[in-house]
Amino acid sequence: MMFDKHVKTFQYGNQTVTLETGEIARQAAAAVKVSMGDTVVLVAVTTNKEVKEGQDFFPLTVDYLERTYAAGKIPGGFFKREGKQSEKEILTSRLIDRPIRPLFPEGFYHDIQIVAMVVSVDPEIDSDIPAMLGASAALVLSGVPFAGPIGAARVGYVNGVYVLNPTKAELAKSQLDLVVAGTSKAVLMVESEAKILPEDVMLGAVVYGHDQMQVAINAINEFADEVNPELWDWKAPETNEELVAKVRGIAGETIKEAFKIRQKQARSAKLDEAWSAVKEALITEETDTLAANEIKGIFKHLEADVVRSQILDGQPRIDGRDTRTVRPLNIQTSVLPRTHGSALFTRGETQALAVATLGTSRDEQIIDALSGEYTDRFMLHYNFPPYSTGEVGRMGAPKRREIGHGRLAKRALLAVLPKPEDFSYTMRVVSEITESNGSSSMASVCGGCLSLLSAGVPLKAHVAGIAMGLILEGNKFAVLTDILGDEDHLGDMDFKVAGTTEGVTALQMDIKIQGITKEIMQIALAQAKEARLHILDQMKAAVAGPQELSAHAPRLFTMKINQDKIREVIGKGGETIRSITAETGTEINIAEDGTITIAATTQEAGDAAKKRIEQITAEVEVGKVYEGTVVKILDNNVGAIVSVMPGKDGLVHISQIAHERVRNVGDYLQVGQVVNVKALEVDDRGRVRLSIKALLDAPAREENAAE
């Protein structure tokens, strides 16, 4: 037998999931092919048995890649092969990474790489859940010290009922799109967007997803028992109490002093001073990587212990706040003169400059997804320059973190956007993080909402976001509102909630430990709501509702014409529409149903374009009088062609020019002459008969008799 193949199948919601190993990619530490319906993902895990010199963090790399052949397509563009990772690929890579990372032991610094490749796709079944299950199974089979497996589930909420792993069609009707991942004991990660749902429905979805994923976790465990992989013989380094005492002796007091300093830069400088003292005393050129890492680890633990014990003992936090207080807020709108909408949102030492721009339907982003091409009328881009944390750094393409934070802020605002038929603009928000000390993504939600209102977008409600932290030791725990950067790194859970006064629009959770219960999450969500309402009050005081459209934003005018008139508006080879746009300085889009959208920089230009289109599409009415221009004298003295509207000509027969007998048309009419005509008839082919005579008084009978 060439292949030692193992297969495990289980039912997951309405889908059948199959895990296979031993046939493909046998040189990887472990490889699992996951099928869910027709969606197939191949996940391979490779590991490095040696730790690299100087390695002082856990080097886990996750790459989720979509191949266009999976959907039976050939890539577009010049090169005809897959290029840089798409936003969906980056976000899914993060989705796999986040629940897996905390399950590796502390002090484990071996390289681990996970590559998940989508090789077949069913447009109704998203490949992210199979990729997460595949990564979980492959890690268990690789034998590395991984405290998994994890399960992952997508949860929808349709007509008041939770739906496990909804299809794309079901998601379209769902008020919720939530992905949850966790182990058999605890939830580790949540990523979601919702249409303004109450906290208890959100928490219910998390608990429901965690219950349902146990099927997948059990299946992976059974699969591993069958394959029976060889486990790594890796032991966590034992704590060297003597070394801990040395580090504490050198730096303990300085660390305590540092965490009493409320200003971030000064606090960081004090901590650097403490670390330098430790380095000088204990690390020499001869110290190997393992020993240096041990000292770094002890130092980090000391930092964490100081902050955590202060908070759990009920002492004030690093910056002097209690656990429930939001840092001071400052809100300014319309801060940039030529932009369509702008806001500067400052919360303590975190600040976002958010700018909204309005465009036309031509500005929509075209997304070429595996499941099919679609357009997006709302974009939110998040930028995190190095100066926001007072550092020197490289400016370049957005990093994975920036893509992830931008997507979270976007998901928070989607639920309150006006319907396209009520507001046909394309919207782009850019959030420039100008200062950062904790939860800049939530500052982007608040700033983004304010900038859209400043641009005149009729949002259904104000949206605010808040980042929460949690510290848990034994049976003591503290939930922290509006966490600082330091609290984020030293805490056990970081979760972000965005929403309106009515409910939640986005929830993201990352949990680093296994003991967080439903009750703790409930308390945390309630505390987050209190903070959100406080921020919303201040936002509403600053901007009550949508402002007037900026003078610099395009004006959109919509009108509806008969579908059979579309050809006339476009003209031969697009001639008519080009001349209208050139003359009026507007941009015109025509939909197949006859809806015309005119984008203009001024009201006058928009009205002018609208008038031209109305003239082209207008019908000649029988009995109506028009001012027309003679465009042609017909041969053989038949009559003249008179233009009564743009693109609408009619015939004035020789008998309809005057009451007396006309011998020669040229004696009465010249090309270019302006005449008043009355429409006599429009035949079924659209030909128009006109009369000049009908508007002239008939000569008196006596004069006729006298002649």
Curated annotation (Swiss-Prot):
The name this protein goes by in its record: Polyribonucleotide nucleotidyltransferase
GO BP annotations listed: mRNA catabolic process; RNA catabolic process; RNA processing
Other remarks on this protein: Present in outer membrane vesicle formulations which are used as vaccines in human.
Domain S1 motif: 623-693
Domain of life: Bacteria
Role, per record: Involved in mRNA degradation. Catalyzes the phosphorolysis of single-stranded polyribonucleotides processively in the 3'- to 5'-direction.
Domain KH: start-end pairs: 554-613
UniProt enzyme class: transferase
Family: Belongs to the polyribonucleotide nucleotidyltransferase family.
Subcellular locations according to the entry: Cytoplasm
Residues that, per the record, bind Mg(2+): 488, 494
GO CC annotations on file: cytosol
Co-factor requirement: Mg(2+)
UniProt-listed InterPro entries: ExoRNase_PH_dom1 (IPR001247), ExoRNase_PH_dom2 (IPR015847), ExoRNase_PH_dom2_sf (IPR036345), KH_dom (IPR004087), KH_dom_type_1 (IPR004088), KH_dom_type_1_sf (IPR036612), NA-bd_OB-fold (IPR012340), PNPase (IPR012162)
Listed GO MF terms: 3'-5'-RNA exonuclease activity; magnesium ion binding; polyribonucleotide nucleotidyltransferase activity; RNA binding
Species of the source: Neisseria meningitidis serogroup B (strain ATCC BAA-335 / MC58)
Recorded catalytic activity of this chain's protein: RNA(n+1) + phosphate = RNA(n) + a ribonucleoside 5'-diphosphate
EC number(s) recorded for this UniProt protein: 2.7.7.8
SMART domains found in the cross-reference section: KH (SM00322), S1 (SM00316)
